[in-house]
Regions:
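Nucleotidyltransferase catalytic core that binds NTPs
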Residues: 1-171
């Protein structure tokens, strides 16, 4: 469970599965010791079996480059968590006010089929969110300013051994 978001609700929203189908699958996952009895949190074994990919950006106006980058990020793992920059961070990055609020951008990104969960980032420190999500892979867009070395070193400081992958420029 991340920021109060129940994973079962995400599954219901993003799939055409019926409630009884979801319940049956969750029961199977509990029997395999992948999901806890509360039906919403993963066991350590379950957590280790999923490859979580974290991607981030401003996402003020979604364009084909965003879609390409998010599709490439999703292909790297099982769960794609996307972090939308706060309004203040967006101003610092883009040197202008965003057209859409951080909540609107979160809602828009969360509506994309490829995205499993979208969060609003933390002010000033990207590693607060990274520590919270604990991804195995951090996906960077081809045009993002962050350097792989900076991300790798920041992850080490929070005891996270995440791989960093940068997508190629869309042609």
């Amino acid at each position: 469970q991340i920021n109060g978001t129940n994973p079962v609700e995400i599954i219901k929203k993003k799939t055409m599965l019926l409630d009884n189908q979801i319940d049956t699958k969750i029961t199977e996952l509990i029997e395999k010791n992948l999901v806890n009895e509360d039906k919403i949190t993963l066991t350590e074994t379950g957590r280790d079996s999923l490859h979580i990919v974290l991607a981030g950006g401003v996402f003020d106006i979604i364009h084909p480059g965003h879609i390409s980058t998010l599709n490439a990020a999703k292909a790297l793992g099982d769960v794609l968590v996307v972090v939308v920059a706060t309004d203040n961070t967006a101003v610092k990055m883009k040197k202008r006010n965003p057209i859409h609020s951080q909540e609107q951008r979160q809602e828009l990104v969360n509506s994309l089929e490829v995205v499993d969960l979208c969060l609003i980032g933390q002010e000033e420190n990207i590693f607060k969110t990274v520590k919270h999500v604990r991804p195995q892979i951090i996906a960077l867009g081809y045009d993002q300013i962050h350097q792989e070395q900076f991300i790798t070193e920041g992850c080490k400081k929070i005891n996270l051994n995440a791989k960093v992958a940068r997508s190629e420029e869309r042609r």
